[in-house]
Each structure stands twice: as structure tokens, then as C-alpha cells.
Amino acid sequence: MMATFYSSAQAMTKTKLAVVGLFLLIVGGAAAAEDQNKIFTARAEKEFHRAQAQFQSATNDSTNAWQFARACFDFSELVTNATQRADSARLGIAACRQLLVREPKSAPAHYYLAMNFGELADAEAPSITAYKLVHEIEREFKTAAELDEHFDFAGPVRNLGQLYFQAPGWPLSVGSKHKTREWLERAATLAPDYPENQLCLAEAQLKWRQRDEAEKTLKKLAAIWPAAQTNFTGVAWEKSWGEWRVRRTAAQAEFQKLFPAAP
């Protein structure tokens, strides 16, 4: 997020996709990585069009609106064309804003407004507009957290933590170690059985060289892993599991590198 001022979700997602892509290159070659990305992108595009049609059939339906905004985000984060990414994000932003006129206290609308702001910032970076969007993202995630901190497995809380973790610190941006710790620990407490929350916290702790804290979080991740594999299943979770497995392996390797066991 240093030069392009990605949103929390965008910066995190781009990092994860890069790691997963590298893993696929190692174990299966470039063709495997490309094929996998094409599959995920095709699925996201199909869902985008389905959700768009559903939304257009009843634009005053609240669920239709935020689910379309979610589909806009999911599609935007996978496409490689910046113009296409920005266009999809703007559609998501418009759907959220339209919903918020009617329901200003809609947590999903504030949440996906922040997510799509992140995609728009990524598409337009580097620019002053992208830089300014960071504060919009922060505000919308905070509002979503105030309205429903449990939404999307503590998504608003987790993504605030990731925003503060990925962003440069003051005076350049909103980055803050203290706020990162506060929000990521809170997300891990609110939805402890969701792998993403434990992974985000562990990755931050490893960056800060916090041995005891990272060890505790990685043990918690190991404890919830078997149940998570049965709770988060199906096509919709394939991409997440591909990323989670690679990130868990990387976190374990980083822990061993930073804190080698005594001979």
C-alpha cells in the first residue's frame, strides 16, 4: 500500500494472490497458475452478471443492492485491466450509495462501499484521488464496524486492522501499529474460528517479531483448521482455501526462520 495507497482489503488480496501465484508456479508451472486465475475470474464475472440482473430487477431491494456491490468487488479484484476494475468498482459504489440514501445504517452498504473504494483506489493509483480514498475507506469501515462488527466474520474490524497494517504511517497515511494490533486482535476475538482473522493477526505479529504472540496465534489457527475445513466448503470457498493454505505454510516457515528451535 506504500506507493499506490490500496485499501486494506485490496492490499491484502493482492499480496495473497501474489503468494498463491508463486506457489502455483513452483508446483505446477505458469500454465497452472494462469488456468486457476482464469477459473476464479470467470466465476466472479458470472456472479457479477447474475447479481447485476438481480439488482436491476428490483433496485429497491436492500439485499440485491449490497450483494451486487459484493459481486462488483469480487470481480474487480481479479481482473487485470485497470479500466475494467475501475468500472466495476464504480458500479458497486453507486449501488451502495443508492442503498445508503434509503438505509443510512446499513452495515453491508458501508462495508462494500469501503471495499469498492479500495478497488477504485487501486485502479487509479498512483494519484491524489487514490490517496484521498484511503480516508474514505477508513471512515466507511469504521461506520460498518459500529453498525455490525460481526458482519462477514468481523470483516469491518479485520479490514480496519489490515488498513492500518498496510498503509504508511503519519504523515503520509493512516498506518499505525497500535491500531493494527487493536483491530486485528478484536477481529480474532469476534470471529475466532474464521482462518482469515487468525492469519492476519499472525502475519502482523511475525512482522513485529513477537515470538510468544505469534506462536499462540499459530497454535490457535492449527486448532480451528480441521473444523474450518468442514464449515467453509464448496466452490465459493476454493479461492480462499488456496490462499489460506499458502499463507499458513508461509507463516509457519517465517516463524521457524525468525525463531529457530534451540539445538
Regions found by a protein language model. Give the residues of each.
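Short, solvent-exposed mixed-charge patches
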Residues: A261-P263
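Bacterial N-terminal signal peptides that target proteins for export
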Residues: F5-V19
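Extended, low-polarity transmembrane helix blocks
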Residues: T143, A204-W208, F255-L258
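Short coil/linker segments at helix-helix boundaries
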Residues: A33-R50, F68-K105, Y111-T143, L147, ...
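Helix-start (N-cap) detector for alpha-helical repeat units in TPR-like alpha-solenoids
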Residues: S62-T63, A107-P108, D152-A154, P195-E196
